[in-house]
From Swiss-Prot:
Function: Essential component of the TIM23 complex, a complex that mediates the translocation of transit peptide-containing proteins across the mitochondrial inner membrane. Required to direct preproteins in transit and direct them to the channel protein TIM23, and possibly facilitates transfer of the translocating proteins from the TOM complex to the TIM23 complex.
UniProt keyword annotations, A-Z: Membrane, Mitochondrion, Mitochondrion inner membrane, Protein transport, Transit peptide, Translocation, Transmembrane, Transmembrane helix, Transport
Protein name: Mitochondrial import inner membrane translocase subunit tim50
Keyword rRNA processing listed: no
Amino acid sequence: MLNRSLLFRNLRLARPRPFLPLVGKRFVTEKSQSQEEKDTSKITENAKEEVKRDTSSLAKESLKLLDLNGLNDESYTGDPGKGPEYTSSTMLKREKQARYAFWGFLGLTGGGLLYYGRRYGPDEKELEKQYPAAGYSPSDWWNRVKARTNNFFSYYQEPAFEKLLPDPLPEPYNRPYTLVLSLDDLLIHSEWTRQHGWRTAKRPGLDYFLGYLSMYYEVVIFTRQYLATAKPIIDKIDPYHVSISAVLTRESSKYEKGKVIKDLSYLNRDLSRVIMIDTNPESWSKQPDNAIAMAPWTGNPKDKELVGLIPLLEFIAIMDIKDVRPVLKSYQGKNIPLEYARREEKLRTKLIEDWNEKKKKGSSFLFGGRSVSEEPPKLIIDIQRERQKAAYAEFKKYIDENGPKMLEEEKAREAEQKTSIFNLLFHPEEVQQQQLEQMQQQQFSPETNASK
């Protein structure tokens, strides 16, 4: 603003003033009047030229004065070909800072490359096996840089733990097979509407599916959701925590090439006895032979696809299949419930035909043959299925009667554990006193004295 005000003040000094000749007579002839007009126009043009020259010289002097005194903080660009472009001190300072930042970035990048390209240390044996590079050639140097860079990012791409599940329990408490189930669009379906907001539906037959198969399998929920959003849903599906053995969330997945993969090799289980049921091909891309592909459930209340898988899963567990992968591979690309029902019916028909053949041949004691049962025989799978259904009915009855009590006891134990940790951190004297009292009660209890 200062330079503009000075400039306009100087320009006002050189403002052209109109010049009119004095006329002595009021009335003149037409000839003298035209001659006077010509003279006046010439004088006016000369005055304008002088004013222009004076104005340009005054403007230049004003700009020089402003530049020399450092009063102009705004960049000014003159006419082309009339001197260099003016750059303010602020812009010069910014350019200097940008140059420092650029060279600093180059220095840090170069230093990082030199550091990452150093020879492997004694604690990098595994990395050296994956990316062997023992020399100092540019290729070896670059291989070490690439190896350490990949190792750095793998911390965020690999699952949170090398063993996602604890070691299996000893016999007879363990389950010989592990069933890995997805959550979204397999067991539940969530949708959002303007009227109701978010709502989550449970798939038909889900309670029976989880409860019945938990007698054969170690049921593991492996979801793409994070733990904070998945846990409330799991608590609704299995409120008494009797069917689901473990829950694995997004933190346990593997991120590779933009895909979220459920790598079963991290489960700490024998893959020959692991079955995954999922709706997303990316999930089983590492172990496709262990997967049963399902179409996403869209909320149909009459759906029976999930319950239709029970006979096949039941057959695998009852027959103690050593490796589930060949069995699952034989069902790929087929409707599993219908295909299994067809195969089982074929076995049942063959068994009945053999029984009829023996019956026709006459297996009476008169001819020295063995007696044939009057009732048609049953498949082993049918006999075991009847037993398991009866056991599940008893289990379901027990859970319905004692489930709320079990849940209250579990919550009380959790609250006691939280209190114990708090007291141990802030009131260790109280914890020691409680332990002494418990020991004294155990020593002087009637049961202890009787045993002695």
